[in-house]
């Protein structure tokens, strides 16, 4: 099976290989003129930016290719085979050539657990060592919240990492969305939570002035986008009087949650739930109840966390803009916000139905739990994005709802 689709006669990506020399004056304390190598903009104007998503059939084939180009992965795989080969051969001799089922399950689990972690660690290590170049590309191309803006940055960094032997392929970022996500995880969030200059220098070293300029450029582009949502109102709902909240359709919220849990998105969690029941069948009633209850609570937790991760940055901006501009106050205000966002997220195909929020109470909880709570703690959490660029607007939304007079 061919993994990579050819783009030209030489089966090479159309990313230009020629570089040009350009000097950029950096602003900051004690920062002098420094030269960087960036890909010629004229080439990008005449040719389409090509990323791995245009060359590979899908994300899986790209990752499969990257894994087998990774020296760490090949070394780990060899050690794993050497570790289990003697046991495998002895099992074959002792049980009449029947493949040991438990050994197969164990090896599969080890691969599933360690392989993504190895790849993620390698990616993060490369980015951590290339913060200055990452920042320079952002300053040069000024990307905003639109994922399309990050295509040139991703293509440039893919070529730069390969040419400077920081990565062993030209396909470091699969697409622009991965580059945008890396910016948030490696630059925006870690740098923003640092409280003083000394801690920034300790963590980021000589890259601090470049990161500061990159974040300033991104902040400017983000503010332009926010004005579209908050002043020009790029979207306004129609016929809201015919929209009903799920609380009027379902008798209980529990029924609404169950419907969301038992859909295709959470099918793996449902399989895990059934596996818990099967494993605990002969372990006693108490153990069985604990396993079943734990599996169900896990599925509820996954459902709650799935909602914010399904929203893009533009959707979150629309959510905050809707809160700030809502005229109704109190519980009625949150009901109206829930109606508008249910319609918006359905029209934008973020959610499959107009049932994203159960009611106004659920909408208010969602805002407090996934937005305002992070503004209060300003600490990264594994199940919630920090939304650093939204902090000023989260605070404004909270103050708006607090200042609203009761009905």
From Swiss-Prot:
It comes from the Eukaryota. Coiled coil: none annotated. GO terms for biological process: protein transport to vacuole involved in ubiquitin-dependent protein catabolic process via the multivesicular body sorting pathway. The keyword Membrane applies. The chain crosses the membrane at residues 75-95, 98-118, 261-281. It is found in: Membrane. Its main location: membrane. Keywords: Membrane, Transmembrane, Transmembrane helix. It is a multi-pass membrane protein. GO terms for cellular component: endosome; membrane. Belongs to the DUP/COS family. This is Protein COS9. It comes from Saccharomyces cerevisiae (strain ATCC 204508 / S288c) (Baker's yeast). The gene is COS9.
């Amino acid at each position: 099976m061919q993994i990579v689709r050819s783009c030209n006669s030489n089966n090479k990506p159309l990313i230009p290989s020629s570089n040009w020399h350009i000097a950029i004056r950096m602003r900051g304390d004690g920062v002098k003129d420094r030269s960087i190598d960036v890909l010629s903009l004229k080439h990008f104007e005449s040719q389409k930016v090509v990323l791995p998503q245009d060359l590979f059939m899908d994300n899986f084939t790209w990752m499969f290719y990257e894994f087998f180009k990774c020296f760490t992965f090949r070394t780990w795989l060899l050690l794993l085979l050497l570790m289990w080969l003697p046991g495998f051969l002895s099992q074959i001799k002792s049980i009449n050539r029947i493949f040991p089922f438990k050994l197969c399950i164990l090896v599969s689990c080890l691969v599933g657990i360690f392989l993504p972690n190895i790849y993620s660690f390698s990616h993060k290590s490369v980015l951590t060592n290339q913060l200055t170049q990452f920042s320079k590309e952002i300053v040069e191309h000024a990307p905003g919240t639109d994922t399309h803006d990050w295509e040139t940055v991703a293509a440039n960094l893919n070529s730069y990492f390969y040419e400077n032997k920081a990565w062993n392929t030209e396909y470091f970022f699969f697409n622009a969305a991965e580059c945008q996500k890396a910016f948030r995880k490696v630059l925006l969030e870690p740098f923003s939570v640092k409280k003083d200059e000394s801690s920034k220098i300790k963590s980021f070293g000589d890259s601090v002035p470049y990161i500061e300029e990159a974040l300033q450029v991104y902040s400017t582009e983000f503010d332009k986008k926010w004005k579209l949502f908050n002043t020009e109102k790029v979207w306004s709902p129609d016929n809201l009087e015919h929209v009903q909240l799920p609380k009027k359709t379902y008798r209980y919220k529990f029924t609404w949650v169950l419907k969301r849990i038992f859909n295709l998105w959470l099918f793996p969690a449902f399989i895990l739930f059934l596996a818990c029941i099967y494993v605990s069948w002969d372990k006693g009633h108490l153990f069985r109840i604990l396993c079943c209850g734990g599996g169900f609570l896990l599925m509820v937790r996954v459902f709650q966390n799935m909602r914010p991760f399904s929203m893009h940055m533009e959707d979150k901006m629309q959510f905050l803009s809707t809160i700030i501009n809502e005229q109704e106050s109190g519980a009625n205000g949150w009901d109206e916000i829930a109606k508008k966002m249910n319609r918006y997220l359905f029209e934008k195909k973020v959610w499959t139905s107009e049932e994203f929020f159960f009611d106004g109470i659920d909408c208010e909880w969602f805002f407090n739990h996934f937005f305002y709570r992070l503004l209060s703690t300003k600490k990264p959490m594994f199940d919630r994005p920090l939304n650093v660029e939204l902090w000023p607007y989260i605070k404004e939304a909270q103050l708006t709802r607090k200042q609203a007079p009761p009905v």
